[in-house]
């Protein structure tokens, strides 16, 4: 990292301790005539979403994070990942504190377009 303030460095150094467990999401990218790189990465993303759903079902909390360190080659080296692996994010896992956040009801018509009737 370049041009990092002391406050930013403190934030980065404390990030791994925000939760009692971190699941590092990696994808092994292989050349495949029928499965492009993006689909290989999205399959990992799909697995991560299912992990988050399972955590919630078991009354745990989880959040997906990325940021500078998710895509930093030095982190991949530190984790001893081979060059064909990419970190795509981190799942921070723990026990929820407080109550569930109330999510406002959205007007679906603002986000959905119907092409036919």
Regions found by a protein language model. Name each.
Residues 1-43:
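Glycine/small-residue-rich phosphate/adenosyl-binding loop
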Residues 14-17, 81-83, 104-105:
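Solvent-exposed alpha-helices and their adjacent loops that cap or buttress functional pockets
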Residues 27, 66-67, 95:
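Short secondary-structure boundary segments
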Residues 39, 60-74:
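GST superfamily/GST-like fold recognition
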Residues 45-48:
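A short mixed-secondary-structure module that forms the rim of ligand-binding clefts
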Residues 53-57:
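Short hydrophobic alpha-helices that are characteristic scaffold elements of the AMP-binding
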Residues 75-88:
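Short, electropositive alpha-helical surface patch
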Residues 87-117:
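C-terminal helix-cap and adjacent tail motif
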């Amino acid at each position: 990292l370049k041009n990092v303030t002391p406050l930013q460095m403190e934030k980065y150094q404390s990030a791994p301790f925000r939760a009692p467990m971190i699941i590092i999401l990696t994808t092994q990218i292989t050349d495949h005539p029928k499965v492009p790189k993006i689909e290989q990465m999205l399959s990992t993303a799909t697995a991560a979403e299912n992990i988050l759903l399972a955590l919630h079902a078991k009354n745990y909390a989880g959040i997906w994070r990325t940021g500078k360190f998710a895509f930093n080659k030095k982190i991949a080296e530190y984790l001893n990942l081979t060059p064909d692996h990419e970190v795509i994010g981190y799942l921070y896992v723990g026990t929820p504190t407080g109550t569930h956040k109330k999510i406002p009801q959205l007007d679906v018509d603002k986000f959905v377009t119907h092409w036919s009737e």
